[in-house]
Amino acid sequence: MSEIGTGFPFDPHYVEVLGERMHYVDVGPRDGTPVLFLHGNPTSSYLWRNIIPHVAPSHRCIAPDLIGMGKSDKPDLDYFFDDHVRYLDAFIEALGLEEVVLVIHDWGSALGFHWAKRNPERVKGIACMEFIRPIPTWDEWPEFARETFQAFRTADVGRELIIDQNAFIEGALPKFVVRPLTEVEMDHYREPFLKPVDREPLWRFPNELPIAGEPANIVALVEAYMNWLHQSPVPKLLFWGTPGVLISPAEAARLAESLPNCKTVDIGPGLHFLQEDNPDLIGSEIARWLPALIVGKSIEFDGGWAT
């Protein structure tokens, strides 16, 4: 595996969305279907820095920073999932994206799947990893992080940890990567949230994870897009790592059997932020998969046969 780069070699782009500026990466040729990269919590487009260069030679790559995150504006919002839906919907329309291939992770997956369910004719493929799915009980949440996330979801304690102590950035983020993140990388992830007042999204997201039936509205929304995924023929590319967090090897095997038109790639050792452990494999396999969306052929992936 080559050395994992820490730089962010992309010019900034901004677009006004619902009265706020959203930052995004925009590189690659303008013809053809664009590839839309969606990050989750507590990251930004920086998460895709070593993956986009594999795809950009042949496809337009767009990677926004969700509202309140990265270099995007930080309006005074509650940062419920529905707030992110409104801003992402408006972002896609502001850029005039008629059709897209989605590359999604964490809460970016929930946003992407929810958008795809509502706009199926505009989605040409979905590459996903460590995506948001219903977690029936806390017993299915990784033991090493169970108490921490239960604390995050305890009102006063959670706000103290995430807002005041910045525990999601300083604690949860590095624990969910197999390799040690460098100080340069950590500083990139810290930069948008240096002020406690800007950390509201970091607190809201773990409180909306669909675990043990709560919160009910998010559980219903996630179940709805999971039902759609199990019915839709849209090409899917699922990356998984060992041991994983949201998607274990066993869960990946079940999804490979139950999701139609789904290819899978084993990235090797990985927890939640797979992009930080094996970005070159993820990027190269996405680049190899994209032509298959047009010609419908089978490809032998480095992670094994995928058809």
Curated annotation (Swiss-Prot):
The question of whether Transcription regulation is a record keyword is answered with no
Alphabetically, the GO molecular function entries are:
haloalkane dehalogenase activity
Q: Which GO terms describe its biological process?
A: response to toxic substance
Any single Pfam family the record assigns to this protein: Abhydrolase_1
Signal sequence span per UniProt? none
Gene Ontology cellular component annotations, sorted alphabetically: membrane
UniProt pathway: Xenobiotic degradation; 1,2-dibromoethane degradation
Give the induction text.
Constitutively expressed.
Taking every annotated instance into account, which residue ranges of this chain make up the domain AB hydrolase-1? 34-158
Record EC number:
3.8.1.5
Q: Which residues form the active site?
A: D106, E130, H272
- Which transformation does this protein catalyse, written as a reaction? 1-haloalkane + H2O = a halide anion + a primary alcohol + H(+)
What keywords are assigned to this protein? Answer: Detoxification, Hydrolase
Alphabetized InterPro entries for the sequence? AB_hydrolase_1 (IPR000073), AB_hydrolase_fold (IPR029058), AB_hydrolase_sf (IPR050266), Epox_hydrolase-like (IPR000639), Haloalkane_dehalogenase_2 (IPR023594)
Does the record carry Hydrolase as a key word?
yes
**NCBIfam families hit by this protein:** PRK03592.1 (NF002938)
Q: What does this protein do?
A: Catalyzes hydrolytic cleavage of carbon-halogen bonds in halogenated aliphatic compounds, leading to the formation of the corresponding primary alcohols, halide ions and protons. Has a broad substrate specificity, which includes mono- and di-chlorinated and brominated alkanes. The highest activity was found with 1,2-dibromoethane, whereas low activity was measured with the analog 1,2-dichloroethane.
**Similarity remark:** Belongs to the haloalkane dehalogenase family. Type 2 subfamily.
Q: How does it assemble?
A: Monomer.
The entry's protein name is: Haloalkane dehalogenase
